[in-house]
Curated annotation (Swiss-Prot):
Protein name from the UniProt record: Nucleotide-binding protein NMB0738
Gene Ontology MF term list: ATP binding; GTP binding; molecular adaptor activity
Annotated binding of GTP, by residue: D58, V59, R60, S61
Organism: Neisseria meningitidis serogroup B (strain ATCC BAA-335 / MC58)
Keyword GTP-binding carried by entry: yes
Pfam families assigned: PapZ_C, RapZ-like_N
Length: 284
């Protein structure tokens, strides 16, 4: 049976993610105490029900992270396919969302401010985030989050999933990257007026960057580094690794490098490509 555990920071979009799972055909349960998860799985097995399960777990249920990781390991030992989806957002974004909705944080009380509650929750859930596929919703609306969840569900995973993500430094760095590489020292197509309107997916930019020896040297170096270290992470039973590639605006160099790496790694690893700034190319 396939089981998806959805967790993350309050205000980051867990409910939206769970609704998308339901729309995708999953049997969904919100805020299930973890000690009840084996009983839920057994119930569906006894009914010969092949429905895929999506369960939201968070601080409201007094989640014990050590217990959560043990539950995941136990279910996997029984042959179930267990995935963890973790949604998060920047602190300032979460504060704004709580202010707009006028809802209280689950950990808020007279002795703890909203910021303190968010910090405690982030620290509490970090061990779960370490084994999860992470979606940062800071710059997403509900529709974009739903799209990101749908794209994640499309990837058939039997081993390590490598997420290749392009981004622009001027918009901030991804907070869920395992490896991050800076492309700002490479020749920039942006300064060519004819290339500026294009992205790193378009042939004119490809032809330009393909002809730059420094760019090809960078691709070779990143490929060598990544292929050296990914097997070690796989040995640690990691399910996901995010490789973030950044340039100034996230439109040309970083997109090109991600696509180039994807072509080289295809067939060796399961890949998910994300272009954070080039929205029309995202989550293919």
């Amino acid at each position: 049976m396939k089981i998806v555990l959805i967790s993350g920071l309050s205000g980051s979009g867990k409910s939206v993610a769970l609704r998308q799972m339901e729309d995708s055909g999953y049997f969904c349960v919100d805020n299930l105490p973890l000690e009840m998860l084996p009983a839920l799985v057994s119930y569906h097995i006894e009914r010969a029900d092949e429905t895929e399960l999506a369960v939201s777990v968070d601080v409201r249920s007094g989640i014990d992270i050590g217990q959560a990781r043990e539950q995941i390991a136990s279910l996997r030992r029984l042959g179930h396919r267990v995935e963890v989806l973790f949604v998060e957002a920047e602190e300032s974004v979460l504060v704004r969302r709580f202010s707009e909705t006028r809802r209280g944080h689950p950990l808020s009380n007279q002795d703890m401010t909203l910021l303190e509650s968010l910090k405690k929750e982030r620290e509490w859930l970090f061990p779960l985030k370490e084994i999860a596929y992470c979606i940062d919703t800071s710059k997403m609306n509900a529709q974009q989050l739903r799209h990101a969840v749908r794209q994640w569900l499309k990837v058939e995973r039997t081993g390590l999933l490598v997420i290749l993500e392009s981004f622009g430094f001027k918009y901030g760095v991804p907070n869920n990257a395992d490896f991050m590489f800076d492309m700002r020292s490479l020749p920039n197509p942006y300064y060519d007026p004819e290339l500026r309107p294009y992205t790193g997916m378009d042939k004119p930019v490809w032809d330009y960057l393909d002809g730059q020896p420094l760019v090809q040297e960078m691709v070779d170096d990143i490929e060598r580094f990544v292929t050296h270290w990914l097997p070690r992470l796989e040995d640690e039973s990691r399910s996901y690794v995010t490789v973030a590639i950044g340039c100034t605006g996230g439109q040309h160099r970083s997109v090109y490098i991600v696509e180039k790496l994807a072509r080289r790694l295809k067939g060796r690893y399961e890949l998910l490509i994300r272009h954070r700034q080039a929205q029309n190319l995202s989550d293919r």
